[in-house]
Amino acid sequence: MRSNVHQGHVARKRFGQNFLVDDTIIHGIVNAISPQADDVLVEIGPGLGALTDPLLERIPQMQVVELDRDLVERLRRRYGERLQVHAGDALAFDFDKLAVPGRPLRIVGNLPYNISSPLLFHLMDFADHVRDQHFMLQKEVVERMVAEPGSKAFGRLSIMLQVRYYMEHVLDVPPGAFNPPPKVDSAVVRMIPWPRHSDGRLRSPHADCDITVLGDVVTAAFSQRRKVLRNTLSFLRDQVDFDAMGFDLGRRAEEVPVGEYVELARRLGGTPSGRAGQAA
């Protein structure tokens, strides 16, 4: 049997399909998720059910979003009423419609690596209705997500996600845990949205800001990583007094803490507004 065939299904490159087959890894992920009977659990890209099976051993029902039409029919036949299958592209899916008052969503998935960053930004739009997210991603992406200022991995993805989520690198996953095996190492990340105060402000280590303005600032700052910020952000001098706010333009973009980028965005953009997807 060819290496890209698993349980009679041919993995499709255009969908970024790599099926998880290692039972030890699978149960490690499920234990990290720790599903409870009353959870509103949503899986993105369930594939052949590697995570779906053990999750449904612990909870009575769940929902999935699957793009591959062949797998949609297969999942419906296999799980029946215990699994509500939403056929469609997660990048365009409205996760708000799955929210239940008082029961925020728990979203999980082995995400296609070719769309992981756009999907993470898309999901930011629904963070107010999410309790947590557990995703399998390319290890390099997870390292960028949780990176600290001053490291080579620290960049736009780190800043934009850390403003909205507490994140934790949960476990590493080798290529051999998949069929077909990807060419890169993988990892699982836990993402917990920062809650809000009663007035709508985020209870984040960083001040709230206009996410669209922050995205523009960070994109400009990292447009020339090897140069200091005097070369990339000096065009903003007419709008903000960098010296007065103690923002040193002699640093490189990766040396600036998240909070300083947020404060710069606040001074440029005023009150928080905008959708996360606009910052992508």
From Swiss-Prot:
Family membership noted in the UniProt record: Belongs to the class I-like SAM-binding methyltransferase superfamily. rRNA adenine N(6)-methyltransferase family. RsmA subfamily.
Protein name per its UniProtKB record: Ribosomal RNA small subunit methyltransferase A
Pfam families per UniProt: RrnaAD (PF00398)
Broad class of where this protein is predominantly found: cytoplasm
Location within or outside the cell: Cytoplasm
Assigned keywords, A-Z: Cytoplasm, Methyltransferase, RNA-binding, rRNA processing, S-adenosyl-L-methionine, Transferase
InterPro entries for the chain: KsgA/Erm (IPR001737), rRNA_Ade_diMease-like_C (IPR023165), rRNA_Ade_Mease_Trfase_CS (IPR020596), rRNA_Ade_methylase_Trfase_N (IPR020598), rRNA_adenine_dimethylase (IPR011530), SAM-dependent_MTases_sf (IPR029063)
Reactions mediated catalytically: adenosine(1518)/adenosine(1519) in 16S rRNA + 4 S-adenosyl-L-methionine = N(6)-dimethyladenosine(1518)/N(6)-dimethyladenosine(1519) in 16S rRNA + 4 S-adenosyl-L-homocysteine + 4 H(+)
NCBIfam families the UniProt entry points to: ksgA (TIGR00755)
E.C. number(s) listed in UniProt: 2.1.1.182
UniProt GO MF annotations: 16S rRNA (adenine(1518)-N(6)/adenine(1519)-N(6))-dimethyltransferase activity; RNA binding
Binding site for S-adenosyl-L-methionine: N18, L20, G45, E66, D89, N110
Keyword Thylakoid listed: no
GO cellular component, one term: cytosol
Function, in words: Specifically dimethylates two adjacent adenosines (A1518 and A1519) in the loop of a conserved hairpin near the 3'-end of 16S rRNA in the 30S particle. May play a critical role in biogenesis of 30S subunits.
Keyword check for Cell membrane: no
